[in-house]
Amino acid sequence: MFQKVRKQRFEHREKIQGKYINILEGHELHTDVFSESEQRGIVDYVFYLRDLGRAGRLRKRTYSEPQKWMRGKRRITIQCGCCYNFTYDNEGNPPGIIRHDEMALIPTIIKRMIQKMVLWHVLSANCVPNSCIINIYEKGDCIPPHIDHHDFLRPSSTISFISECNILFGSDLQTIGPGEFRGSAEIPLPLGSVLVLKGNGADLVRHCIPGVPRRRVSITFRKMDDSKAPFGYRPDPDLEGLRPLEL
């Protein structure tokens, strides 16, 4: 049960605007949240969605796969609950949630992940996620340095599957090559773990995933700011009224 979950907090101080600040303040790593059998079921479903996307059976913005592979440039994404841009798109839409697009609903197996994380005291019942992005990485794929858009509330959370990697943080993250970055602090992401991002680590410094050494899947959950949600969005009743188990 949830008593087996271990929570770890982090500290790494950097001088920012003349003050030494813990840039990892707010981050929590919860290990042993999802069992090996749960991980297998989730990963199988992720690749089922990938196959649907490749067959053209998912909406255009829901499924995205770069046509040409280049180290540090390729990553398959599947978005549910909302779709958002990382940068300006070809239609001139700015970074953030695209409000006029019809969104794909969060699948049942993914909703069960959210329910479990709230029940097990990993996520707060006051900020239940209502969107997610699935990332499928092949060897060398990465996520460049960024701060999550403020169309989404804090905290966000990310879960790791298939292979482990590190997430890198820093007030001065540097790109030193395709998929290669230099920062001042890193946090390991064990399989089946949940990293909760909030506080200084979510808003004050950037983070990134350097080029991964082997195939990996991650699922990142976020709660939309109500004022930024897609037009016509309706709360999912399966994610309403969730409460943690009593300790």
Predicted regions and their residues:
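Non-heme Fe(II) oxygenase metal-center motifs and adjacent flexible, charged/small-residue loops
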Residues: 1-247
